[in-house]
Amino acid sequence: MNQSELIRALPKAELHVHIEGTFEPELMFEIAQRNHIDIPYKSVEEIKKAYNFHNLQSFLDIYYAGANVLINEQDFYDLAWAYFKKCAEDRVVHTEMFFDPQTHTERGVSFEIVLNGLKRACKDAKEHLGISSHLIMCFLRHLSEEDAFKTLEQALPYKADIIAVGLDSSEVGHPPSKFARVFEKAREEGFLVVAHAGEEGPPEYVWEALDLLKVNRIDHGVRSEEDPALMQRLIQEKMPLTVCPLSNLKLCVVNDMKEHNIRRLLNQGVHVTVNSDDPSYFGGYMNDNFVAIQAALDLSNEELKKLAINSFEASFIDEEEKQNWIEEINQI
């Protein structure tokens, strides 16, 4: 079996994907028309042209503009269902999706509308596509601690539907320490915790996520390599890094995929996984990310399998289910 066949055959878990970042131009245009919302683009082609950006902030500007068309429960359902269909094509059998309630509640869309649409899509994905899923609620780090506390309060009645809380949006200037008290409260309430750190931000942010937020996983974390002591800790603690190669390329975290450090991290014993982040904006879903790193870094079949195994080991599914998928990978 060659590498491209193996990539298609491997079952995978996706642990770092923003549901708002799966918004394809065609669906954005369709929902904007359905909801009679003016967007600054007259066609799908114009939206596609706008998906041309060079850093995290210019991407976020477009990302939030797109999210403005999401108003009704059906909109959130359609968004998630379109992503699940992509998962089915890529043999992503389990996904843990981020959603950003503050992006919607500050526009007057209720927390309940967002969650109900996503929940319904999750249920249908399990029933019709055999894909399991968890929801992870993210706090926007460019907003205040007070705003994050309010969002956490809104989530408390839905603890059964939200497995973890996370931290995303503009990283630089918004260290994890800003939200230490919010994350302490979230942990007390029984949520697992993850956080974006070490993408554009320095290794110090990864230390803070570990020590102050007490995370179960680090999202991105590729800049950890700059700090040997941090690397040692990540390896010792088997701390997962949910790495997003095409995202790193598109946002100029790396200038060339051949420079990406995912293979080095993997071979040094860091628990790295492959993910798509915001696939509609970054030009690729799960398998596209695997294909890109395989082509650039010449990954072996064993390395590809290890990345797939890592995705299940780092997931929040139960141990028996993890072992079943890992066994299947080992038999391929």
Curated annotation (Swiss-Prot):
Reactions performed catalytically: adenine + H2O + H(+) = hypoxanthine + NH4(+)
Pfam families attached to this UniProt entry: A_deaminase
GO annotation terms (biological process): adenine catabolic process; hypoxanthine salvage; nucleotide metabolic process
Binding site for substrate: D278
Database matches in InterPro entries: A_deaminase_dom, ADE, Ado/ade_deaminase, Metal_Hydrolase
Matching SUPFAM superfamilies: Metallo-dependent hydrolases (SSF51556)
UniProt function note: Catalyzes the hydrolytic deamination of adenine to hypoxanthine. Plays an important role in the purine salvage pathway and in nitrogen catabolism.
Domain of life according to the entry: Bacteria
Species this chain originates from: Acinetobacter baylyi (strain ATCC 33305 / BD413 / ADP1)
Protein name as annotated: Adenine deaminase
